[in-house]
């Protein structure tokens, strides 16, 4: 019996730490950002997870998932990424950004 090839998609993950005082403006910007990015060809989803750290700051994880590595590459090079959106609203604190393959 032949095995089916694995389903693979391609993803970015960005992590940022922001001040709680920045949250109201950032939340509205994230809603607009999500609507904008999900219109890009090949974007399956944009998800943001939030946790409040012990010092009261907020830790955000932003994930985008793409159909092909080419679509992800174009987004990272020229698209309106999470990092670019944060810079536009005057928020600093990007901790790391990764490009990954999503297996499940």
PLM features per residue range, with description:
Residues 17-29:
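Short, surface-exposed ligand-recognition loops at beta-strand->loop->(often short) alpha-helix junctions
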